[in-house]
């Protein structure tokens, strides 16, 4: 046979096989499709593999499956099934099929094969004597319940040993000597039974019930006709249970967004086919022109996977955040265990919009040129002559009336100037007040006067033709002449009225100019134009908006003063096209003085921008603690403290997301609800701090804000669930020390509801939820949740060696203590403690008779360095204290001449210049370590107790303050 020759030709290239070893059946080294021949003898080959996915394992109570296990090439109209062939042999034979595991080492599986020719979980089929191809058309897989895995596996192993069905490979290597016997089943010794029991016990713990493989073994007859000659077995591809999360085909069904900013961090809701929450990734990738691949992964935790069908994640940062045009990439699901991926979907990264509030764009707008105010010749037919020149051109786009030139801002105007109608009754939302349409009263009064175009039109109408003169009656001529006379008179009246008003306006402005020349006070000029402050430009900005955008604080103050009592309430709260009030812009542009001026002038604190943000939200987002402090003093601030924006976030949530410790402390002190839930998923500020892995803010919320440590989201998730799912040992330790319960169940089922079949008819109640212990991703977190003390990565000796505070002399320390005891709040020990990250201990320091000394002692034993101390003093502007430290290092060298030269030599203290510090460094100093908790974990500060010398971080609160009963004191 030609096809047999192919296999025979391969024999010379194959090594001679010893008895089966685990290495041969390592799935990474062994390909099931390849025949495993013996030297010049018969061997078994798989002709068609079973279909890997789409076949469901069924429980006993579900009944038999509909149709057998299909083959890999099976189609809807062309069914196929697994097939094997005994090569190089013709005659009677027996083929058995067993279910084995998919691990690195092959073992018997607890599931059973059912169907035709199947008994006790094993399928036995005879082959030959002519056709050596064997098909398995009716195979089904019976899913064993979790409770019966050990019992079933032990029985299956016992049968394999008694019948000699590969016991050395599938049960234990020590049982390899057991072979098939012609006389029937053999009896097992007690030692063999114990080996089987221990093997079953061990393999039960490691068995994956969602995947199996078929192992085919052929037996040929011996001289007595008994089937004892075993050929080397072959193993199929893995077969995955279709209802198992890690077996289904990955598929993205829907995303609520398909584009995002290059900076990442944008939240996307993704619907998908069944996934396993701890075995799934969201991969973004781009194939580069040079053949390389960029990839990034969405940020989410197991708590963000809802019922295996939805994932809420944040986009990763793109490789280049400075792109100028959109970049197209792909997004796909990827399973961690086998790296299988879904079909990729397109995703677009667009350039960062750095000026979302459009402040920079408006600042870059061309400034008006002073020379544009001179020469009315640019108007529609206007001549020259200067501002009050006699150029006789008519009023056009560049002039007012017969010759007054004013800069044009694009308003609907008389000659470029806009008069706001009814300024004493103006609407704060009104834009572009115009008077280019005559009112109803004007059109009906004064003898039914009409405009100049009407006069010109009527003038044309009243010129009769010769034919009209001949045919017209005398009465018509009189009437027509009378009408024309009336209209001409009205036209002259309107012209005179307009000129009179224009002259009055000019006199007012001239008098204001004289007053300004005498006093030098610009308010003299602004006072006569205060009614125009309600006019808005093409962006909806008033003069007050523009003055704030261009950082003219004094002009803002002048405008507020001249409009006081007239239309101030309308103008000061007027919104532009972005729904920004002047107060919003003052916060965005970080102008503390302007914010204060606007509030004093009556600005409304409660107005929201287009995204629903109040000024409290904006100040917290920008990390402007000084502005936030001003705002919180307002009487309406209390009503806005817990008001959500369009994203459902309160100001305290935004302060946490912006990593602003000063803003968080201000909000907590002002009475903000630290347990308030954001509107999307019910997360509190503590949840957000844990999500951002910010131990400093989490500690502040617990210690300063008395946050409820076991607060839950809409799906019952606590902060400890998030910390455990993300594998954060430090946050898990902090929350556990604060009394968090590791046994709280959320609403996510611990196992798939479809697994209710496993109960085999037994009612075991509802499916339990998932606890933090269930979600622990590493052993460190698991041990902490079980009460094991937190162990840092470094020992105390290593960390203490980093400090050099001992180099300071006692005299220098005494001088520092004295300087830090002054009452100045900007230069005392309390401010220094905040800068050094020990601010959380200030209340304890105050109990000490010498707070400054206690602070410095704590800083020294926590491994503090002189460099950090000097930098903190530099931020405070405390030059006297810095000079004390410098003198302490210079004095010894000045007294002792350098050997060999005899000249004094000064030590250069490694002080970092404030000018070289980046804003990021300042944020880190002021925010990350400000609560003291971060310092405790980072330095393992073995602080001597202020009263008894106990450990440095002890969370001592009443049980009810953490929402727990019983003792909750924890030490880290």
Swiss-Prot record:
A motif (Nuclear localization signal) lies at residues 360-365. One of its GO terms (cellular component) is nucleus. One of its GO terms (molecular function) is transcription cis-regulatory region binding. Signal peptide: none annotated. Keywords: Acetylation, Activator, ANK repeat, Cytoplasm, DNA-binding, Hydroxylation, Isopeptide bond, Lipoprotein, Nucleus, Phosphoprotein, Repeat, S-nitrosylation, Transcription, Transcription regulation, Ubl conjugation. Residues 905-918 have a biased composition (Polar residues). There is a cross-link at residue 325 (Glycyl lysine isopeptide (Lys-Gly) (interchain with G-Cter in SUMO2)). Residues 425-473, 894-926 are annotated as: Disordered. The modification (3S)-3-hydroxyasparagine is found at residue 675. CDD domains: Death_NFkB1_p105, IPT_NFkappaB, RHD-n_NFkB1. PROSITE patterns: ANK_REP_REGION, ANK_REPEAT, REL_1, REL_2. Residues 647-681 are annotated as: Essential for interaction with HIF1AN. SMART domains: ANK, DEATH, IPT. Residues 435-972 are annotated as: Interaction with CFLAR. The modification Phosphoserine is found at residues 337, 756, 908, 912, 927, 931, 936, 941. It holds the Pfam family RHD_DNA_bind. The modification S-nitrosocysteine is found at residue 61. A lipid is attached at residue 61 (S-(15-deoxy-Delta12,14-prostaglandin J2-9-yl)cysteine). Residues 814-889 form the Death domain. Generation of the NF-kappa-B p50 (Nuclear factor NF-kappa-B p50 subunit) transcription factor takes place both cotranslationally and post-translationally via non-mutually exclusive mechanisms. A cotranslational processing allows the production of both p50 and p105 (Nuclear factor NF-kappa-B p105 subunit) from a single NFKB1 mRNA. While translation occurs, the particular unfolded structure after the GRR repeat region acts as a substrate for the proteasome, promoting degradation of the C-terminus. The modification N6-acetyllysine is found at residues 431, 440. Residues 39-246 form the RHD domain. The C-terminus of p105 might be involved in cytoplasmic retention, inhibition of DNA-binding, and transcription activation. NF-kappa-B is a pleiotropic transcription factor present in almost all cell types and is the endpoint of a series of signal transduction events that are initiated by a vast array of stimuli related to many biological processes such as inflammation, immunity, differentiation, cell growth, tumorigenesis and apoptosis. NF-kappa-B is a homo- or heterodimeric complex formed by the Rel-like domain-containing proteins RELA/p65, RELB, NFKB1/p105, NFKB1/p50, REL and NFKB2/p52 and the heterodimeric p65-p50 complex appears to be most abundant one. This is Nuclear factor NF-kappa-B p105 subunit. The lineage of its organism: Eukaryota, Metazoa, Chordata, Craniata, Vertebrata.
């Amino acid at each position: 046979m030609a096809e047999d020759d192919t296999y025979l030709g391969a024999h010379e290239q194959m090594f001679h096989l010893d008895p089966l070893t685990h290495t041969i059946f390592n799935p990474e080294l062994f390909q099931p499709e390849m025949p495993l021949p013996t030297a010049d003898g018969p061997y078994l080959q798989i002709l068609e593999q079973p279909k890997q996915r789409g076949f469901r394992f069924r429980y006993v109570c579900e009944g038999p499956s509909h149709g057998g296990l299909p083959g890999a090439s099976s189609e809807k109209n062309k069914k196929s099934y697994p097939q094997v062939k005994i090569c190089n042999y013709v005659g009677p034979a027996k083929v058995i099929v067993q279910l084995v595991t998919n691990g690195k080492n092959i073992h018997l599986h607890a599931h059973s094969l059912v169907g035709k020719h199947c008994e006790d979980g094993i399928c036995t089929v005879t082959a030959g004597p002519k056709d050596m191809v064997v098909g398995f058309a009716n195979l089904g897989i019976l899913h064993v319940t979790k409770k019966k895995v050990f019992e079933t596996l032990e029985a299956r192993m016992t049968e394999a040993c008694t019948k000699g069905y590969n016991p050395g490979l599938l049960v234990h290597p020590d049982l390899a000597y057991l072979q098939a016997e012609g006389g029937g089943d053999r009896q097992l010794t007690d030692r063999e039974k114990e080996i089987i029991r221990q093997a079953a016990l061990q393999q039960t713990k490691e068995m994956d019930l969602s995947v199996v493989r078929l192992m085919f073994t052929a037996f040929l007859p011996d001289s007595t006709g008994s089937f004892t000659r075993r050929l080397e077995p072959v193993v199929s591809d893995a077969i995955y249970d279709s209802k198992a999360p890690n077996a289904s085909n990955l598929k993205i069904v829907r995303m609520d967004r398909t584009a995002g900013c290059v900076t990442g961090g944008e939240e996307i809701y993704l619907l998908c086919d069944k996934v396993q929450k701890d075995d799934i990734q969201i991969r973004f990738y781009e194939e580069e022109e040079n053949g390389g691949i960029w990839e990034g992964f969405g940020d989410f935790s197991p708590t963000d996977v809802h019922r295996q069908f939805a994932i809420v994640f944040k986009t990763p940062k793109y490789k280049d955040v400075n792109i100028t045009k959109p970049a197209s990439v792909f997004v796909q699901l990827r399973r961690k265990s086998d790296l299988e991926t879904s079909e990729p979907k397109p995703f677009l990264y667009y350039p960062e919009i750095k000026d979302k509030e459009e402040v920079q764009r408006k600042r870059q707008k061309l400034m008006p040129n002073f020379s544009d105010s001179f020469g009315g010749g640019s108007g529609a037919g206007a001549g020259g002559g200067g501002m009050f020149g006699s150029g006789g051109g008519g009023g056009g786009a560049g002039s007012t009336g017969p010759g007054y030139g004013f800069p044009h801002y694009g308003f609907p105007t008389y000659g470029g100037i806009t008069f706001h109608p009814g300024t004493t009754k103006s609407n704060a939302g009104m834009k572009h007040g115009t008077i280019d349409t005559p009112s109803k009263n004007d059109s009906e009064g004064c003898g039914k006067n009409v405009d100049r175009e009407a006069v010109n039109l009527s003038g044309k109408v009243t010129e009769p033709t010769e034919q009209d003169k001949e045919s017209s009656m005398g009465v018509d001529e009189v009437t027509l002449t009378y009408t024309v006379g009336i209209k001409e008179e009205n036209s002259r009246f309107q012209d005179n009225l307009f000129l009179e008003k224009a002259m009055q306006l000019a006199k007012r402005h001239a008098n204001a100019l004289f007053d300004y020349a005498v006093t030098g006070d610009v308010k003299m000029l602004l006072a006569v134009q205060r009614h125009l402050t309600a006019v808005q430009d093409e962006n909806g900005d008033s003069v007050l908006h523009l003055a704030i955008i261009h950082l003219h604080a004094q002009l803002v103050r002048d405008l507020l003063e001249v409009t006081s009592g007239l239309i101030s309430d309308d103008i000061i709260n007027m919104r532009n096209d972005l729904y920004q009030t002047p107060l919003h812009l003052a916060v965005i542009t970080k102008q503390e003085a302007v914010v204060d001026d606007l509030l004093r002038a009556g600005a409304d604190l409660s107005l929201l921008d287009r995204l629903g943000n109040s000024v409290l939200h904006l100040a917290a987002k920008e990390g402007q603690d000084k502005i936030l402090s001003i705002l919180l003093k307002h009487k309406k601030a209390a009503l806005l403290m817990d008001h959500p924006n369009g994203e459902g976030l309160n100001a305290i949530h935004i302060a946490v997301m912006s990593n602003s410790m000063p803003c968080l402390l201000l909000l907590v002190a002002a009475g903000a609800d630290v347990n308030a839930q954001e509107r999307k998923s019910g997360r509190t500020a503590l949840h957000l701090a844990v999500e951002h892995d910010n131990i400093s803010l989490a500690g502040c919320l617990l210690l300063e804000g008395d946050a409820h440590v076991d607060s839950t989201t809409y799906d019952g998730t606590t902060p400890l669930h998030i910390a455990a799912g993300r594998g954060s040992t430090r946050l898990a330790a902090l929350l556990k020390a604060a009394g968090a319960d590791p046994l709280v169940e959320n609403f996510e089922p611990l196992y798939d509801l479809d697994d209710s079949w496993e109960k085999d008819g037994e009612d075991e109640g509802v499916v339990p939820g998932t606890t933090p212990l269930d979600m622990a991703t590493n052993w460190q977190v698991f041990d902490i949740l079980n009460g094991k003390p937190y162990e840092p990565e470094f020992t105390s000796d290593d960390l203490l060696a980093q400090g050099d505070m001992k180099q300071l002399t006692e005299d220098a320390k005494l001088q520092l203590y004295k300087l830090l005891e002054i009452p100045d709040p900007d230069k005392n020990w309390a401010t220094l403690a905040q800068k050094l990250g020990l601010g959380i201990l200030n209340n304890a320091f105050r109990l000490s008779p010498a707070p400054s000394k206690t602070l410095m002692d704590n800083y020294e034993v926590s491994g503090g360095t002189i460099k950090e101390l000097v930098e903190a003093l530099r931020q405070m502007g405390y030059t006297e204290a810095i000079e004390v430290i410098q003198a302490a290092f210079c004095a010894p060298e000045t007294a002792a001449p350098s050997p060999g030269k005899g000249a004094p030599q000064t030590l250069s203290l490694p002080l970092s210049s404030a000018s070289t510090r980046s804003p990021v460094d300042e944020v880190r100093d002021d925010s990350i370590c400000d609560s003291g908790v971060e310092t405790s974990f980072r330095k393992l500060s073995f602080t001597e107790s202020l009263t008894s010398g106990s450990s440095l971080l002890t969370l001592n609160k009443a049980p009810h303050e953490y929402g727990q009963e019983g003792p909750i004191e924890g030490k880290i």
